[in-house]
Structures are given as C-alpha cells and as structure tokens.
C-alpha cells in the first residue's frame, strides 16, 4: 500500500500526516460531502430559495464550491455516487423521481479536473463502484485523474448495493454482500499490480537525443490470473504522482471493516451517536492492528451535518426553517434504498424492530442500536435522516459547533468529519 497521504498537503505529506495522526495535538480533518445531483442527502431542500443544488449540471456551481472550500481550508471534497435508482419504497422509483432523491444524477468523474484547475490544495475523493467497471480501464481513469490533479485524488471504494443498478447491467439480482467484498479484494490486487508494479521508477526517459520516450525493459505485464479477473498486459499510463490514489472505504459492516483493515487509508462511517462511533472506530483500529498495520495509519471520518449561525439562537432558527422543506416521501425513498426495507408498508407511527437485509447492513444496525431506550418510528427515522442523512446534526454558533466537533474527536478517537449539507453552498 502507498503511504498515508494527507489530502490537503501541497508538498509530500507522508511524514506530516503520520505526525499529526499520532500527536497529542490532533488536527481535525474536514471534507465537504456532496454528490453530482440535487439535494444529495437532504431531500426536499432543493426547493429552499437559497439552495443551489439544482444547478448541479452547471460547471460554475462546482467551480464556485471548489473555490469556497479551498478558501475555507477544507481538506477535501468527498463526492458520493450511486448507479441506480431508489426504487424500494412502494416497489417503485416514483417517489425518488418526484422528490429528486439522488435522481437525476450525473457522473462524478468529470467534475474533478475543472475543480482541480482552480485550486491548489483541495483534495478530491471520487466514489466509484468496482461492481460496474473492469479494473483495467478503471486503473487508467485513476492514473489520468492523479496526473491532472497533481496527486490530489482519492478513490472511495464501494461495492454497490442497489438492486436496480445490478439489474441494469444484466444481473438478475445484486451479488451477496460478503461475496461482493471477495470480488473487491481481487479487484484491488489488479489495481495495485497495474499502478504500482507495471512501470518501474525510471521507465519514462523522455530522451530526445536518442528518441526514446520509455524504456520497455522497465515496463512489465502484470500477468494476473484470478477467480474473477484475467489481466495479462501492462498498465497504459506512466506512473502518476501518487501511483495509487488515497483509498477510502465506506462500509461499516463486519466484512466491510475487514476489507478496510486490509486496504483503506481513510474510512467513512455514519455513526449517529458517540457511543456507536467509539465502538466502530475501536473495531476498525483493532482490525488494522491484526492485519499488521499501525491502527492510527487509518484516518476515520464520520458523517456529520452542521448548521451554524452567528449565535446559537440564530442557528436554531435556521434549522427550524430548513425542516419546513424536508420531504417525508423523499426521506423514506432514501431510507428504503439504504436499508432494503420498504418503509411504505408502515404507518408513520409504526415502531420498527431490527431487520436484516442485504442492503447497507451497517445502516440498519445504526438506527436499531444507536439508542436502545428509544422507540424508533418511521416518522422519527425520516425526521432524523431528512437533513444530512444518517449522521448526527450539530446546530449552534461557531463556538458551539467547534466545541461539539472537538468533543466527538476526543471522546471517540475519530479523525475528522465528512460534512453533509442542508442548503448548498450556504451550509459550507
């Protein structure tokens, strides 16, 4: 694996990232969390008069956001993605379509290059599912982005969970949860061989006098033959600044955490409480140690939504204003897709019990076990997830928010946060 790399660094940052992670004076890492769609994880808030997410298809929207985040010293922009539609609610995608619940959604890859052009330090975390593209062409995409961003790109590795996505690439049903991670393990082995092993250092000569650009003796076919992939050839790209981009992993099931312990440099989780987050962080670090890694070589980010005002009262008023725009139907469409549970079959006051599904098992566990004393109803769940998704919400003045984020770091050992928005770009 490549060494730990800090997204925001403008110089080689391996030592600095490790130093910060291990020091007593910890730096809180902040990523903005967005998606190439309307509203992302705040269904209905696209109708708010100050929201710009409906402009997602305009390049100016993304360039403005990149400049804002660079000015605000964010470490990176974490770009989510989904290839499929949320069609579990009432067995139809109609609710998602009506409420613009992550549909329409454009490809995230094309956003990165123009945003990199107007920034110097901002990192970019690209979500790309390894379920829908062969590793050979995808390795070329990663190298290309790493070249064009001068080493500021990361890859959020997801295995995909929507049945609709599987059906639209010719599969009758989604592959079993754990089998997808077995597939992912081999996928990563192919990626490593292509990015790290195919081209030696010094293979690119650019020798004008001898008219030799690259030395074929230093470029090697990977000759991979495995259960899922056969890749005999060389990587098509010369080595990029990082070779392998920063690797994110965003699943918190037991198998997902095992995968993260072996591969990830950064892990994205969505724990709604400090108790659950502390347990999750400790589990990930324990698994990393068992895999022979320094437990703190993995940076762990929790989903968080912040609503800030000049005073606590102003922030609370802003939150109350935002809640008027939340779409209950859109929230249920998200929740149904995330968990595989059709919440349309329940009344709003229906109390839910723990349910095992094949879709985002960690999300099901989160709302079922986060607060054992709370009776979770469909309405309560929709209210909770309606602004920012499954993560906790922090509302208050700048001082209140800073103190609260610091307390999460100190009490849970988390390294930072992926900050979702209620209204964009206002939230950021």
Residue ranges and their predicted role:
Residues 1-4:
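Leucine-biased recognition of intrinsically disordered, low-complexity hydrophobic segments
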Residues 15-428:
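N-terminal glycine-rich cofactor-binding segment that shapes the pocket for flavin-like pterin cofactors
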């Amino acid at each position: 694996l490549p060494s730990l790399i800090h997204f925001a660094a403008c110089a080689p940052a391996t030592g600095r990232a490790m130093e910060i992670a291990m020091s007593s004076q910890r730096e809180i890492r902040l990523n903005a969390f967005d998606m190439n769609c309307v509203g992302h994880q705040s269904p209905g808030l696209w109708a708010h008069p100050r929201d710009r997410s409906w402009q997602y298809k305009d390049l100016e929207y993304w360039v403005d956001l990149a400049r804002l985040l660079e000015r605000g010293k964010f470490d990176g922009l974490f770009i989510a993605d989904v290839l499929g539609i949320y069609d579990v609610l009432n067995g139809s995608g109609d609710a998602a379509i009506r409420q613009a619940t992550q549909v329409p959604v454009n490809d995230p890859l094309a956003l990165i290059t123009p945003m990199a052009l107007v920034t110097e330090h901002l990192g970019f975390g690209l979500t790309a599912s390894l379920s829908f593209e062969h590793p050979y062409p995808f390795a070329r995409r990663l190298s290309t982005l790493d070249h064009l961003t001068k080493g500021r790109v990361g890859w959020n590795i997801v295995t995909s969970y929507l049945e609709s996505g599987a059906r639209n690439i010719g599969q009758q049903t989604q592959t079993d949860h754990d089998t997808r991670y077995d597939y992912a393990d081999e996928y990563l082995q192919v990626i490593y061989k292509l990015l790290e092993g195919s081209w030696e250092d010094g293979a690119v000569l650019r020798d004008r006098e001898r008219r030799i650009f690259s030395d074929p003796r230093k470029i090697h076919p990977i000759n991979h033959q495995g259960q899922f992939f056969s890749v005999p050839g060389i990587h098509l790209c010369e080595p990029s600044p990082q070779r392998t981009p920063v690797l994110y992993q965003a699943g918190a099931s037991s198998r997902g955490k095992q995968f993260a312990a072996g591969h990830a440099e950064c892990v994205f989780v969505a724990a709604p409480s400090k108790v659950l987050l502390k347990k999750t962080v400790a589990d990930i670090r324990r698994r990393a140690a068992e895999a022979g890694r320094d437990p703190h070589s993995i940076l762990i980010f929790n989903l968080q939504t912040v609503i800030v005002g000049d005073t606590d009262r102003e922030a609370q008023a802003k939150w109350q204003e935002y809640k008027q725009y939340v779409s209950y139907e859109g929230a249920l469409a998200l929740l149904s897709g995330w968990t595989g549970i059709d919440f349309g079959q329940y009344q709003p006051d229906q109390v839910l019990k723990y349910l095992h599904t094949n879709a985002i098992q960690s999300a099901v566990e989160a709302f079922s076990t986060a607060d054992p004393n709370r009776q979770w109803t469909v309405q309560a769940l929709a209210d909770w997830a309606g602004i920012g998704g499954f993560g906790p919400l922090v509302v208050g003045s700048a001082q209140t928010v800073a103190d609260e984020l610091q307390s999460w770091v100190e009490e849970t050992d988390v390294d930072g946060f992926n900050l979702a928005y209620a209204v964009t770009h206002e939230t950021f």
